[in-house]
């Protein structure tokens, strides 16, 4: 009895858990999944860790080097007149400590600088992942909007085709009006194929970044959408000078190249090593004539300490050549820094201009949608009284939905440009994604079939016009008015 009482509770808990798992993902959740599973970011993290671990390798030659050696030798004097056999065992312990070797110290410094560059690279890859995730996410939302508007446009033109066919059947319009409406409907059908494919590709691009498919995503909350103008461009440039990661990486690379010149010049300097050691040796003899003094068994130990000094005097010009190579590399790194600086200035200014252009585009397309709707209403009213043609109505319909698509695209472009300028400044982080995440609203499906279900019956009805267009064209007006078969949309 208790199990029967618990069963509904367990089922309810399992269903509630399933609904949580199936909820629409928002931008922040998608990014967290990408951060954990993106192979490019994980590779970058591994490269950074390897670079820092290599610092320990570069430091190791400066630390004491301790070695243990052992040796055993057996000698058989079968051709020796004395017939002496011997067993010799020896062992040694040797320590080497670098007292002065500037090239090894320089190598440690170089590796520390190289690890710093790799760390900046990892930070850049983190920001790149944030930008790529947002790009892919909003690209899916934009593709969904485009498909939705294309579907709405198709429905609107279908209604116009239906109405025009009815008017043609009763002799109110010419066959050219029906043909124009049908041509526009076919154009939208062809465009629908493209936008469906674009949505599929956008979903696939998001999967490539995160490793997951998302049946639903949180959509943009258009009602609460607002725009903010960026700071003055000079203030942005000053901030980018100090924080842009590409610029920082170029500066570190120049500093590394400068240090490599010093390392090459160290090839002229001497080295000094301390080499203390201790060893023992045990020798025993056997044979018929081992009574001589030189064949007495021995057991000896020895301690040594020494200094090893080396000064390169001439190496065939190798050191001078290495110095010149390092100097040329420094020139190249300096030019790369200048190139990075120019690129940062261009990127910041372009991002600043793009944000302002996006804001202007949003405002312009808002007005364009209002104007296009008013124009369509006027064209439909004029067509109903005969002052406008069906071409005017179709053009106005296309203009309206084009404006709606452009408005949606302008909103997403603005959001991406907001991230682009943060990326150019070098300050892009998860807080920026949280800010964008707050602009999202209700969940929407991501599959084309769910966004805009296909309408085979409607398309078939539109195709049916071709089979019936010839017959009504030769019928008198009264006959067309009384015919039920002249309108393929009434099947």
Curated annotation (Swiss-Prot):
Disruption phenotype: Non-invasive for a number of mammalian cell lines; avirulent by oral infection of BALB/c mice. Increased sensitivity to acridine orange and novibiocin. Decreased resistance to bile salts and SDS. Disulfide bonds: none annotated. Residues 267-287, 445-491 are annotated as: Disordered. GO terms for cellular component: cell outer membrane; efflux pump complex. It is found in: Cell outer membrane. Induction: Constitutively expressed (at protein level). SUPFAM superfamilies: Outer membrane efflux proteins (OEP). Residues 467-481 have a biased composition (Low complexity). It is a multi-pass membrane protein. Residues 272-287, 482-491 have a biased composition (Polar residues). The keyword Membrane applies. GO terms for molecular function: efflux transmembrane transporter activity; porin activity. One of its GO terms (biological process) is response to antibiotic. The keyword Metal-binding does not apply. Keywords: Antibiotic resistance, Cell outer membrane, Membrane, Signal, Transmembrane, Transmembrane beta strand, Transport, Virulence. Homotrimer. Part of tripartite efflux systems, which are composed of an inner membrane transporter, a periplasmic membrane fusion protein, and an outer membrane component, TolC. The complexes form a large protein conduit and can translocate molecules across both the inner and outer membranes. Outer membrane channel, which is required for the function of several efflux systems. Required for virulence. Belongs to the outer membrane factor (OMF) (TC 1.B.17) family. This is Outer membrane protein TolC. It comes from Salmonella enteritidis. The gene is tolC.
């Amino acid at each position: 009895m208790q199990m029967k009482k618990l069963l509904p509770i367990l089922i309810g808990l399992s269903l509630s858990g399933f609904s949580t798992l199936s909820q629409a993902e928002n931008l922040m959740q998608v990014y967290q999944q990408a951060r954990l599973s993106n192979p490019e970011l994980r590779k970058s993290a591994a490269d950074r860790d390897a670079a820092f671990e290599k610092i320990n390798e570069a430091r190791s030659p400066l630390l004491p080097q301790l070695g243990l050696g052992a040796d055993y030798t057996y000698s058989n004097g079968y051709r020796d007149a004395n017939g002496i056999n011997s067993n010799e065992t020896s062992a040694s312990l040797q320590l080497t400590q670098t007292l002065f070797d500037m090239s090894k110290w320089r190598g440690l410094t170089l590796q520390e600088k190289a690890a710093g560059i790799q760390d900046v690279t990892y930070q850049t890859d983190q920001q790149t992942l944030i930008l790529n995730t947002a790009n892919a996410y909003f690209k899916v939302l934009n593709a969904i909007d485009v498909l939705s508007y294309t579907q709405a446009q198709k429905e609107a033109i279908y209604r116009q085709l239906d109405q025009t066919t009815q008017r043609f059947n009763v002799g109110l319009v010419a066959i050219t009006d029906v043909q124009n409406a049908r041509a526009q409907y076919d154009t939208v059908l062809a465009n629908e194929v493209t936008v469906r494919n674009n949505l599929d590709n956008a979903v696939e691009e998001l999967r490539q970044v995160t490793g997951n498919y998302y049946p639903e995503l949180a959509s943009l909350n258009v009602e609460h959408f607002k725009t903010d103008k960026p700071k003055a461009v000079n203030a942005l440039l000053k901030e980018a000078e100090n924080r842009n990661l590409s610029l920082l990486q170029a500066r570190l690379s120049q500093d590394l190249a400068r240090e490599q010149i010093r390392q090459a010049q160290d090839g002229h300097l001497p080295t000094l090593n301390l080499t203390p050691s201790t060893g023992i040796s045990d020798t025993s003899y056997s044979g018929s004539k081992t009574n001589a003094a030189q064949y007495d068994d021995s057991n000896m130990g020895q301690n040594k300490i020494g200094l090893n000094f080396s000064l390169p005097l001439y190496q065939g010009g190798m050191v001078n050549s290495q110095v010149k190579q390092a100097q040329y590399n420094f020139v190249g790194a300096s030019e790369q820094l200048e190139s990075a600086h120019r690129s940062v200035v261009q990127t910041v200014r372009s991002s600043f201009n793009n944000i302002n252009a996006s804001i202007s585009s949003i405002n312009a397309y808002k007005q364009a949608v209002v104007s296009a709707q008013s124009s369509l209403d006027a064209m439909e009213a004029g067509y109903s009284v005969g002052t406008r043609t069906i071409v005017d109505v179709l053009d106005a319909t296309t203009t309206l939905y084009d404006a709606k698509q452009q408005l949606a695209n302008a909103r997403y472009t603005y959001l991406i440009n907001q991230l682009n300028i943060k990326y150019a400044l070098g300050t892009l982080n998860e807080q920026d994604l949280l800010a964008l995440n707050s602009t999202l609203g209700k969940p929407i499906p991501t599959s084309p079939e769910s966004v805009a279900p296909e309408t085979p019956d409607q398309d078939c009805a539109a195709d049916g016009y071709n089979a019936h267009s010839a017959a009504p064209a030769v019928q008198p007006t009264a006959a067309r008015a009384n015919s039920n078969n002249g309108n393929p949309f009434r099947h």
